[in-house]
Amino acid sequence: MPVDRRIERQLRKLEKRAAQTSRKPPLSVERIVQTALDIVAAEGFEALTMRRVAATLDTGPASLYAHVVNKADLDELLIGYLCSRIVLPEPDPETWREQIFDLAAQIRDQYLRYPGISQAALGVVPSNPEALRLSEGMLGILLAGGVPAQTAAWAIDALSLYVNAYCLEIGLWVRQMDTDGGWVVTHDTLMGRFEALSEDDFPLTKRYAAELTAGEGHDRFDFAMRTMINGLGGH
């Protein structure tokens, strides 16, 4: 009978839905963190919300709060997870500068995989165990290099701030390219603007336009980091 067939179809749908539900992996902090990172990698940090994570996991926002306190807690977990990927060397008094530089480059590369995520690093106190592991490692390297304790402590903060700001700037460029359909100010365009300036008003900018616009890849990052690190040796 038609009614029976309809009932059978509904039963099959319910059975299929129950089977799919039973096969769905249980919610965990690890799944939440990985889902959040996937969202940031694909759409940027600003797209990350608790509701978005819940929707991607096919659950309700309330379910997340059994594992994550709030968005700030999620941000701290994300930074902690990225810090866990950083390889710490054994402090070496002979190569401490290169060791610190390498750690900064590792952090940079992790953050750049997830556009805008350095905002989370700027907004949290480093209390996550993995973030503290990284801070402990950096402190050990600086102390091994003969940097005074107070200078080393503040240097960690200064170096971290630069890495975060650098990655945030790169993320903003990427976002601008996506928003404006790929349009950005190219090196040649910027050179042209500087060269077109009035020599009476901007004689130095016009004269040193090539130097002001020089650099490829992470050249400027390398320069800034090495300048700061080398300066620590004078203390």
Predicted regions and their residues:
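Hydrophobic alpha-helical connector segments
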Residues: 87-133, 149-152, 156
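Short, basic, alpha-helical segments at the C-terminal edge of helix-turn-helix-like DNA-binding modules
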Residues: 81-85
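Amphipathic alpha-helical interaction segments
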Residues: 31, 73, 102, 133, ...
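N-terminal intrinsically disordered/low-complexity leader segments
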Residues: 1-27, 202-211
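Hydrophobic alpha-helical bundle segments that form small-molecule/ligand-binding pockets
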Residues: 134-160, 166-191, 213, 232-235
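A structured, mid-to-C-terminal "fold-capping" secondary-structure block
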Residues: 2, 181-235
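Helix-turn-helix
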Residues: 31, 35, 39-73, 77
